[in-house]
Amino acid sequence: DILVNNAGILPKFKRFDRYSDEEIERAININFYSCVYSVKTFLPMLLKSTDPGIVNIDSSAALMSLAGTSMYSASKAALKGFTEALREEFRGKCYVGLVCPGFTKTDIFRGQSNAGGKGEKVINMISTDCDLMVKMIMFGIEHKQALQIHGVDAHAMSVFGKLLPVNGSRLFSAVMKAADIDLFKEVFKDDVELAE
């Protein structure tokens, strides 16, 4: 028996001071607490199984935070820490896997009112096909991989997050600014510029 937690939302890219209390709460509740309480609910049943497993689908944002994703990154980093602790607490009793995919061609950008046009093209260029992502994740689960990182962008974020934790984020911010797409507009412009 295996529990796969795959709930997640990506709030609109914007600076932290522009988030409402409701947006903050929603991101934490869906991206983190839903997994915590799902595990809490099903763990007693899973531990009675002959081959139990828990897999939390996280994000490359858990490996390195990007400007404009403060609440998403925080909730995904919390999920990473939770999953890593679970793995040690239940080592030998239950397989616990963490999956950190990069951009995937799904409708996660549905909530991004400004994701169309040039922004959508840029995201699609670095995104992994959904069917391919599923195959890679399923392979990892079948082989009980503790950590899965999939997608060119996810691997880049993993490397930069480890080797250049400060300057890596700066580099990604510079790329986001240079892309000059509406998707990231609220991240780098001040309130006066946004009003114009």
Label the predicted regions.
Residues 17, 66-70:
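Active-site loop immediately N-terminal to the catalytic Tyr-X3-Lys motif
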Residues 7-11:
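Conserved NAD(P)H cofactor-binding loop of Rossmann-fold oxidoreductase domains
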Residues 59:
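Residue(s) in the substrate-gating loop at a strand-loop-helix junction
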Residues 14-16, 20-25:
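Substrate-binding pocket helix/loop in short-chain dehydrogenase/reductase
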Residues 44, 88-89:
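Alpha-helical segment proximal to the catalytic Tyr-Lys
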Residues 39, 75:
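Active-site helix of classical SDR
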